Curated annotation (Swiss-Prot):
One of its GO terms (cellular component) is cell cortex. The modification Phosphothreonine is found at T412. The modification Phosphoserine is found at S2, S422. This is Coronin-1A. Keywords: Acetylation, Actin-binding, Coiled coil, Cytoplasm, Cytoplasmic vesicle, Cytoskeleton, Membrane, Phosphoprotein, Repeat, Ubl conjugation, WD repeat. The gene is CORO1A. Residues 425-461 form a coiled coil. May be a crucial component of the cytoskeleton of highly motile cells, functioning both in the invagination of large pieces of plasma membrane, as well as in forming protrusions of the plasma membrane involved in cell locomotion. It is found in: Cytoplasm, Cytoskeleton; Cytoplasm, Cell cortex; Cytoplasmic vesicle, Phagosome membrane. InterPro entries: Coronin, DUF1899, Trimer_CC, WD40/YVTN_repeat-like_dom_sf, WD40_repeat_CS, WD40_repeat_dom_sf, WD40_rpt.
């Protein structure tokens, strides 16, 4: 009798653990807008989520440790005039976040350490160029201040946030229909896109050339998502002709046939893939699902190995994914998701069971740090570079906020004041606060005089 051989993997027993109630973010009004993005973005300092707003678009930004019930009057980022569709934290500055909206603009915001105390209406810079709603924003992984946006005008624009200028444009001749997803390669030299015309494309954005493309990676008519994974491969999620959800792995040099194709179920939600390059694990989260599936990618056939599935009772309206430097390494946490319910945001930790409390070097190889490897000018000049790596052995402490400087020719002073590295406010911010205090004091004095006159009138009668 033959014996079944079980593949050996240190990630076979990874399990998901939802946070306790007091570690969740309660009473948040998650956006009801229909759009296939995660609606949530997190980093080691903040959690941001797109929320319902009357008369425009807004998203909520909370310090990571500020859990519990969120006040209904909590300040939001509310500068857009139409619903926000996508948000993304800058990988090189944990205080900077970009947002794309139905108002056809991209806005870049600077969040002070400690979070917002007043509504934030003025962005650091507004990026205008799209003619229809902007549904995707994605920062370059290694070049400073390089931001990509994709709109329903079938245009991809690459911006230098430091100047507020569009430096590259991929027009409708590249994507003749709605763009479903865009993902940067690890060194930022390529992007892969999925489009409503049922094609997945690999593009060199600086040359505006399509390096490779695959027609109908999935036979179904519903949206396809595509991301770069290990060794330059691409992973796609989509639907079969019979509306079964699928996940497929492709070699970028040979897109004729998939390296692996697996059918999952018959649910209708689009699967959002999240890839961890340190562990080669990809997590699939479906909007409207109540589960997270995860697979390990290897360099040998069959390449894509199912590991397990985390399930819960309530379905998810969106999902955020924490960068590796924001995890608790002393608990063997290899991933953390932020699941959006209708009125709640729930952290879910993915953990490898280990008995030792010591640092597990095999689980935590050097990972991408917060410093950029290139300037925007170097990348535009043709250079590529992988991320600058850091060790998590001694833990990670987020640095103080760094001011985002925008130079727009004569408009060099247009930027929000932020705390400097020393933690003290800038002189401009102090001057503005002092002026506001003087105005408030004058108003109080005037009101007091009116009250005194009113009392005298009443007493005279």
């Amino acid at each position: 009798m033959s014996r079944q051989v079980v593949r050996s993997s240190k990630f076979r027993h990874v399990f998901g653990q939802p946070a306790k109630a007091d570690q969740c973010y309660e009473d948040v009004r998650v956006s009801q807008t229909t759009w296939d993005s995660g609606f949530c973005a997190v980093n080691p300092k903040f959690v941001a989520l797109i929320c319902e707003a009357s008369g425009g678009g807004a998203f909520l930004v909370l310090p990571l440790g500020k859990t519990g019930r969120v006040d209904k009057n909590a300040p939001t980022v509310c500068g857009h005039t139409a619903p926000v569709l996508d948000i993304a934290w800058c990988p090189h500055n944990d205080n900077v976040i970009a947002s794309g909206s139905e108002d056809c603009t991209v806005m870049v915001w600077e969040i002070p350490d400690g979070g917002l105390v007043l509504p934030l209406r003025e962005p650091v810079v507004t990026l205008e160029g799209h003619t229809k709603r902007v549904g995707i924003v994605a920062w370059h992984p290694t070049a400073q201040n390089v931001l990509l946006s994709a709109g329903c005008d079938n245009v991809i624009m690459v911006w230098d946030v430091g100047t507020g200028a569009a430096v590259l444009t991929l027009g409708p001749e590249v994507h003749p229909d709605t763009i479903y997803s865009v993902d940067w390669s690890r060194d930022g030299g390529l992007i892969c896109t999925s489009c409503r015309d049922k094609r997945v494309r690999i593009i060199e954005p600086r040359k505006c050339t399509v390096v490779a493309e695959k027609d109908r990676p999935h036979e179904g008519t519903r949206p396809v998502r595509a991301v770069f994974v290990s060794e330059g491969k691409i992973l796609t999620t989509g639907f079969s002709r019979m509306s079964e959800r699928q996940v497929a792995l492709w070699g970028t040099k040979h897109l004729e046939e998939p390296l692996s194709l697996q059918e999952l179920d018959t649910s209708s939600g689009v699967l959002l893939p999240f890839f961890d390059p340190d562990t080669n694990i990809v997590y699939l989260c479906g909007k409207g699902d109540s589960s997270i599936r995860y697979f390990e990618i290897t360099s040998e056939a069959p390449f894509l190995h199912y590991l397990s599935m985390f399930s819960s009772k309530e379905s998810q309206r969106g999902m955020g994914y924490m960068p590796k430097r924001g995890l608790e390494v002393n608990k063997c946490e290899i991933a953390r998701f932020y699941k959006l319910h209708e009125r709640r945001c729930e952290p879910i930790a993915m953990t490898v069971p280990r008995k030792s409390d010591l640092f597990q070097e095999d689980l935590y190889p050097p990972t991408a740090g917060p410093d950029p490897a290139l300037t925007a000018e170097e990348w535009l000049g043709g250079r590529d570079a992988g991320p600058l790596l850091i060790s998590l052995k001694d833990g990670y402490v987020p640095p103080k906020s760094r001011e985002l400087r925008v130079n727009r020719g004569l408009d060099t002073g247009r930027r929000r004041a932020a705390p400097e590295a020393s933690g003290t406010p800038s002189s401009d911010a102090v001057s503005r606060l002092e002026e506001e205090m003087r105005k408030l004091q004058a108003t109080v004095q005037e009101l007091q005089k009116r009250l005194d006159r009113l009392e005298e009138t009443v007493q005279a009668k």
